[in-house]
Amino acid sequence: MAHKKAGGSSRNGRDSKGKRLGIKAFGGERVIPGNIIARQRGTTWHPGLNVGMGTDHTLFAKIEGVVEFHARANRTFISVRPVAAQAAE
C-alpha cells in the first residue's frame, strides 16, 4: 500500500509592514512649527538650526520657514531658514 506522508507546514511567510520612513519636507519647502521634516531610524540626517529631534529621531520644524539641507564633516544637517517678513504696502 502506497502512502503519502503528511506535508509539513511552511515556517516562512511573514513580513513586517513598511514604516513610511524618509524625507517628508524637501529642500525649499515651507514648513510651520511642528511639521515633520524627516522620519528615520538613527541619525541619517542631523538637526540643524531651528530643527528639533524626537525620541524616535524624527526631525521636526521649530519655526516657520524654508527647509535647507547642508553637508558638513560626513554629516547631513537639516535646518529651517526663517522667511523674511514682507513689508506692508
UniProtKB/Swiss-Prot annotation:
GO terms for biological process: translation. GO terms for cellular component: cytosolic large ribosomal subunit. InterPro entries: Ribosomal_bL27, Ribosomal_bL27_CS. Pfam families: Ribosomal_L27. Residues 1-21 are annotated as: Disordered. GO terms for molecular function: structural constituent of ribosome. Keywords: Ribonucleoprotein, Ribosomal protein. Belongs to the bacterial ribosomal protein bL27 family. This is Large ribosomal subunit protein bL27. It comes from Bradyrhizobium sp. (strain BTAi1 / ATCC BAA-1182). The gene is rpmA.
